[in-house]
Each structure stands twice: as C-alpha cells, then as structure tokens.
C-alpha cells in the first residue's frame, strides 16, 4: 500500500516513468539536494515535492543534484519526489506580453489572483504565462506557399494594442519551405498559423515561442550605438547622456530617488517598449507603478494620447518573495526585452535593484558552502553581472526585412550606507558605460534628481557628437563650459568657507552665481509638476545656452567695464540693474512644453537677445 502524507499519496503520476523521478535528500531554505538524478542537465527545470514547486538544477555531483527552488520550501520532506522536465527554465513569448504583470518565473499575477481569490500566490500554482484562448487579429505578410523562410524572418503582424504592432517572427533555430500560411483573421495562441517542410520533415508553428532565459537570443551583428536615450531629465540628457543600446548604473543610498528616476525613464524615455523588473524591492513600489502607469499618457507624433502601460511589461519580484526567483526575474526581463528588440524596436529594461539579486546570489552561495569572496559575495559575482549587462546593445536583427533594434539596460544599485566601494557597485561600474551617481546630501537638501554632477560620468559623449552636431552645433561647447563652471564652484567653495564671498574677485562671484543658476534652476527638476516632469531636449539646450550666455556676457562686462572715474562694473551692479533678466533666466523651467516647440524656442530666443542688448546698454551707461 502506498503511504499517505498530508492527505496525498506518495505515488508517481500515471503518465510518468519512475526513471523520471529523483527524491529529496536534504532541504536547506531555498536549496534542495535530490538523489537519483543521473542524466539530469545543468539548469534543467524540475518539479519538487507533491506541490510541484518549480526549481532549477544549479549543481550536479554523481547522481545527486542541487536545486534552487523558486517557491517557499516549507513542508518539503525527505524522500519527496523530484520530477525532471528535460527542458531549461524558459519564457513564453508572443502577443499578450505588453500591459501584463508577471512574477520572476513569468506567472501572470492577475490571472493567479482571479483563480486563487487570494492576495498571496499559492504554492505550486501552474498557470500559462500568456492567455491561450484570447483571439488576436493576425495579418500575414508578403509570403506565399512554396517560399523559403529562415529564422528571424517576420511573417505576420498582430494588432496587440493601439500603440504597438506585434511582429510575429520565425524562431531563430527554424527554417524551411512554407507549406501552409494562415490567411488573415482571428487566431488564438493554440492555433497553427504556419507549417514548414525542411528535409522532408514537416513542422507547425503557432504565434507562441518559448526561449530559455539564460541563453541570449541570436542576432546578425552588433552595431555601434549613435542615438541618445532621451529621458526627459535635464541632468541626464545634457550632462551624462546614454544611448539606445547602452548600459547605465544608478547607485545610491536609500531615499536618494533611484526608483523615481527608473520610473521617469519608463514613463518618458524615447524607447518603443519598456520592461520594468522590480527585483527584491518593496512591494509598495510595484503597487505604485501599477496604479500610476495606467493613468499616465504619452503624446504620439500624430497628436494621439495613449496609456504608457500599453508599451510596458512589469516583472514583479518583491522582497517578500523567495530569494532564488530574483535571479530568474532579471533573466526573464532581459529575454522579454530581447524578443521585442528582434522585432526592430528600441527597448529599455529597468532592473530595480541588482543589489538584491546579488544578495540572493550570496545567500544561495552560502548554502552551497562555496568559498566567499569580498563581503561574502561569491567569486563569480562580476561574471554574472557582466553576462547580464552584455545582453544590452544595438543590433542588426536576424532575418528579413532588414531592421535594427536595441536593448538599453538601466540597473539601480543599492549599496549599504551609500558606500560606492561596495563589491556590487564596483563590479557594476567596471562593466557599464554610464554612471549616474546619486548623492545622499543632495537628496537631504531636496535637490532631485539627486545626481552628483562631480562624480557621475558617461563614456558615450564621443559616440553622440555627430548627433549633437546635427541637432545644435553649439551644444558641445556650451556643455563643456557648464561643466567647467560647476567644477570651478566646487573649488571656490573651500575658499568661500575661509574668507567669505565678499573677498572673491568679481569673476569668481559671477561663477558662483551662474553655478547656483545651473544647480537650482537647471539640474534640479520637479517630477510632480506638469511643466517640469518631462523636459524635451530642445528646451534643455536652450535653457543651458541662455545661462552660459549670461555667464559669458557678465564676465565680458566686468573685464571691459571701467567707467570714466575708474568705477568698474561689479557683479552687484549687474544683478541690481538686470534683475528682471535674471528673474527670467530663473523662470525658464516654468515654460510648459505643451505649448509647442516653436512657441518655446521663440521665448528662449527673445531672452537670449534681451540678455545681449541688456548688457550692451549697461556697458554704454557706465562708460
């Protein structure tokens, strides 16, 4: 007689062979060791125990396998069955991904909530990632029966929503001659829409693909990125730009605004699709995204307003979910991003935060009794981070028609105590090309985004020079001057603390005042106002141009302006006589982009001309 355990028979399923099963020998938190697993493969997906918990093999030794389980392991006992699936951890890719919210192993949270009627995910729940019964409007492209088709070719278009066209591609590892292509109509993800014959073997395809998450999707070639990622944040777009296909890190202590910057990028960046991965962060942050995004709209070039959620996919793996699934959530997110990249879209992926993933690696590494490296993190931490960040880039996609796509990765890092020498931060900085360092002191002064302009950097400035030359030939010189002013202010601050502001030369007083203008009225930005939540690039350029124009004119006036009685033009005189122009400089940020580019550029040009004439009149009066 089979033994009972917890009301369940400890027998094997009728349709499974006994050789497909191992049995649990040891349970240690999320790590399970199973015996009788001869023939299993690394990173093979397994089902552990009577609840069919999802796990992944991470070490093989003899016929025993070490498994990291992606669900709560409470209640597992020795000799519980472990079922092998003979396939790696994979994600389902097809229509229905956008606007959805998944957990770390691509289980749809809305569907689970409806089925279980509970706020928590039941253990061992098995729900298909995408709705197989939903009908999609299928429109085949210019292929006919008898045509040859290869991996990556786009053979149909599906209307996913009013913002995104979903292109259906042949999986990268398939090829052959078309024997059947479904006519235009409505089909579900179960329906066969394409049949191929290759070397006498027929194979049928639906609109759905599965892809192992740890394997990067193949591309024809990698390209040099040359288009900026415009975020709508002045400090990032003007001083530390990234590119479409770049890698960025946002390290910062708690309360510095990492999540707000990540969300601003998701809302306002010039990406076609966004994958937002909440990896080990607070559940409230994902709830905030879920509440905010459906109400947020973006204005399309044709004037239509569309919900941001229509281009967004959320992967939620909050801090109270099992730690092992944090690693899976990062890989799930990047695989979904690569899928949209292969359609020819520019995709942004936000990972908030990679430090929590590294902590999960540390915990599992400790349970495996591996040799710890710096701060207890495993020695392979840098290699794992690199394998993730290297999946970013601008690429030429496989198959036809010829198209380019890109994946931009923005990883938030939460170093304990804001210490940038933390192993995760230093390993990340050795890989990424853009560093947006957040400063606790700026955040405490309520200066947001709290990006420290003295320690941040971007290695893409040279790659973007051709774009800037086309957009505005003066911009590179203006930006260099603005950086010099901010750096000079930092040097002068020590002198000011010793001798006071009044003892400085007139030129230094102008430098300090211009730096204050740049800091408070240019770099600082209020994300909760209609006029400043998003700043178009033309507005950023004109605001900086006018501030630097004021700086140059003031310096020239001070140098040239000796009066008849030897009275020089001082900074206090400039501020007293040109107070209204100074006020207009401060108020540039209040110009609302909703008025349109032509109106705003006209206002900024008028201020530029008024500054020139104002200083000319001042010099004439004091001669």
Swiss-Prot record:
Keyword Nucleotide-binding attached: yes
Gene Ontology terms: cellular component: proton-transporting V-type ATPase, V1 domain
Keyword Nucleotide-binding found: yes
GO BP terms, alphabetized: ATP metabolic process
Keyword field: ATP-binding, Hydrogen ion transport, Ion transport, Nucleotide-binding, Translocase, Transport
GO molecular function: ATP binding; ATP hydrolysis activity; proton-transporting ATPase activity, rotational mechanism
Stored InterPro entries: ATP-synt_VA_C, ATP-synth_a_Xtn, ATP_synth_asu-like_sf, ATPase_a/bsu_AS, ATPase_F1/V1/A1_a/bsu_N, ATPase_F1/V1/A1_a/bsu_N_sf, ATPase_F1/V1/A1_a/bsu_nucl-bd, ATPase_F1/V1_b/a_C
Catalysed reactions listed for this entry: ATP + H2O + 4 H(+)(in) = ADP + phosphate + 5 H(+)(out)
Top-level EC class as recorded in UniProt: translocase
Regions annotated as coiled coil: none
E.C. number(s) listed in UniProt: 7.1.2.2
Record: residues binding ATP: 252-259
HAMAP family: ATP_synth_A_arch
Similarity comment text for this entry: Belongs to the ATPase alpha/beta chains family.
Assembly and interaction partners: V-ATPase is a heteromultimeric enzyme composed of a peripheral catalytic V1 complex (main components: subunits A, B, C, D, E, and F) attached to an integral membrane V0 proton pore complex (main component: the proteolipid protein).
Function text: Catalytic subunit of the peripheral V1 complex of vacuolar ATPase. V-ATPase vacuolar ATPase is responsible for acidifying a variety of intracellular compartments in eukaryotic cells.
Name used for this protein in its record: V-type proton ATPase catalytic subunit A
Species this protein is from: Brassica napus
